[in-house]
Swiss-Prot record:
Subunit architecture: Heterotrimer of UreA (gamma), UreB (beta) and UreC (alpha) subunits. Three heterotrimers associate to form the active enzyme.
Name used for this protein in its record: Urease subunit gamma
Primary localization class, coarse: cytoplasm
Pathway(s) the chain acts in: Nitrogen metabolism; urea degradation; CO(2) and NH(3) from urea (urease route): step 1/1
HAMAP family the UniProt entry points to: Urease_gamma
GO cellular component assignments: cytoplasm
Family: Belongs to the urease gamma subunit family.
Classification lineage: Bacteria, Pseudomonadati, Pseudomonadota, Betaproteobacteria, Burkholderiales
Location(s), subcellular: Cytoplasm
Domain of life: Bacteria
UniProt keyword annotations, A-Z: Cytoplasm, Hydrolase
Organism of this sequence: Ralstonia pickettii (strain 12J)
Gene: ureA
């Protein structure tokens, strides 16, 4: 199977997000890469489901709280930018202050 670099990146994000979801489910606090992957994957899936950019910008702020991440992680992520595939094409979604 031949994958483009972009497809490989998407699979890597999905894999990291799956690991983060499992760890979160066990009550563990997420580290920086896990938190970014968790939010990014949710944004990409929302785009595939047909949600709007504005909806996803808000949705991204509801996924994790400071209680879900290790100390200092929320401050390390001022915003997350995700290039997501929507039904009408690829768009950049920016989530400001994703961890409240």
């Amino acid at each position: 199977m031949e994958l483009t670099p972009r497809e490989k990146d998407k699979l890597l994000i999905f894999t990291a997000a799956l690991l983060a979801e499992r760890r979160k489910g066990r009550g563990l606090k997420l580290n920086y890469p896990e938190a970014v992957a968790f939010i990014s994957a949710a944004i990409m899936e929302g785009a595939r489901d047909g949600k709007t950019v504005a909806d996803l910008m808000h949705y991204g702020t509801t996924l994790l709280t400071r209680n879900d991440v290790m100390d200092g992680v929320a401050e390390m992520i001022p915003d997350i930018q995700v290039e997501a595939t929507f039904p009408d094409g690829t768009k950049l979604v920016t989530v400001h202050h994703p961890i409240v």
